[in-house]
UniProtKB/Swiss-Prot annotation:
Residues 109-129 have a biased composition (Basic and acidic residues). It comes from the Bacteria. Catalyzes the attachment of glutamate to tRNA(Glu) in a two-step reaction: glutamate is first activated by ATP to form Glu-AMP and then transferred to the acceptor end of tRNA(Glu). Its main location: cytoplasm. InterPro entries: aa-tRNA-synth_I_cd-bd (IPR045462), aa-tRNA-synth_I_codon-bd_sub2 (IPR020751), aa-tRNA-synth_I_CS (IPR001412), aa_tRNA-synth_I_cd-bd_sf (IPR008925), Glu-tRNA-ligase_bac/mito (IPR004527), Glu-tRNA-synth_I_codon-bd_sub1 (IPR020752), Glu/Gln-tRNA-synth (IPR000924), Glu/Gln-tRNA-synth_Ib_cat-dom (IPR020058). ATP binds at K251. The gene is gltX. The lineage of its organism: Bacteria, Bacillati, Cyanobacteriota, Cyanophyceae, Synechococcales. SUPFAM superfamilies: An anticodon-binding domain of class I aminoacyl-tRNA synthetases, Nucleotidylyl transferase. A motif ('HIGH' region) lies at residues 9-19. It is an enzyme of class 6 (ligase). Residues 109-133 are annotated as: Disordered. This is Glutamate--tRNA ligase. GO terms for cellular component: cytosol.
Amino acid sequence: MAIKVRLAPSPTGKLHIGTARTALFNWLFARKNNGSFLIRIEDTDKERSQEEYKENILEGLDWLGLTWDAEPIIQSNRIEQHREAIKYLLEKGLAYRCFTTEEELAAMREEQKSRNKPPRYDNRHRSLSTEEESNFLSEGRTAVIRFRIDDNESIQWNDLVRGPMNWTGKDLGGDMVIARRAPANEIGDPLYNLVVVIDDGYMGITHVIRGEDHIANTAKQILLYKALGLTLPKFAHTPLILNAEGKKLSKRDGVTSISDFKEMGYTSKAMSNYMTLLGWSIPDGMDEKFTIEESSKVFDFDRVNKAGAKFDWEKLKWLNSQTIHDSSSEEILKAVEPLFNKEGWDLPNLEWSLKLIELIKPSMTLLTDSVEQSRFFFEDPLLNQDAINQLEIEGAKDSLKILLKQIDTSKINKLTVEHAKKLINDAAVFGGFKKGLIMKSLRAALLGCLQGPDVINSWILLSEINQDKSRIERCL
């Protein structure tokens, strides 16, 4: 049997890291087993679903490298199939119209609360007589549709992460609403637990892999699978991603969407790498820095943890820095060029641009670091106080004057590391200065500060765009 898994996001917000991690585990499992990774957009929440969020979700998955194997299914396009399934359940007596009003439900919950009982529907309209139903209709009452759940029903499955799971019908809060309130002669909008089962059956999903917050839904859905005569998939409930306090990571914790992580300067490789480690233990001998292609060869649910996974910013930053350092300069240039364009900076040529990336790459943690670390090369820097103090040291400006003369008389067409070192050495000998004084003063003049990238290679880059001499001259 060919394995099919799916991600079923709702387009009511940006792609959340929790949803992305679920997508990643689905993708890894599918690739490990030569299966298919499918997408279903669950857009039945008409008020909150937006096209821009759908695009954000798909773009985020694509950025992470989680390619899907068929055109995404749009759930709202299948509402008639969902209603047909509800009709079937009504005809079989497995579902019924419930006329209980919102006020009556609220009173029911209050009464249960007063007795310290958990809220649940008391199934009061499960077996209405024809006369009772007629009376409700004559009152003009609307109705939801509920699926019958026997309190004594045993619900069991072998979870691929958590092992044997045992529930009973009484754990599920009474008969389940499967269609929203509507005039009694109509079927209202079908609800989540029903439509998920219908669509997973239609798509031939063999394994449902999702967060542990869906465990109660799984118990309900198993009953619907059986009632509708659909093949039951296997289930795997992955751990939640937690914040520093051990609570479920939410928008209140700040950045949680994949597009936000991307905007902050995290690479797709580091994000995929880190998300895999959020809840999955690597095999012995495997380095914790890996690609999704590498992890897809060894991924299995035996190594998925049951306990929640705490989000660790420092670990993510470390992985991101390692990914940047190990990436080719061509890759990094492609990633940061849009950032440079946003600043209004023009790259003179490919060779120069790659030299720049080679220069700044070792000190980058985020891709966005490239902007401040490159600003020296596109804008005349203001001298900070350290640079000003350096240039006021006795002999500093005189050493730069001699260096300028050495540059003018050398007639070098293209500055190299060897040329630069010789010019500094000659200036030191000619003027009787220490090379350290010349180097620090040169850095102050060229970069406006005493910290930053290698001064020799910075000088070479600036000389290639005719910015070195003018920066030295302005400090004299």
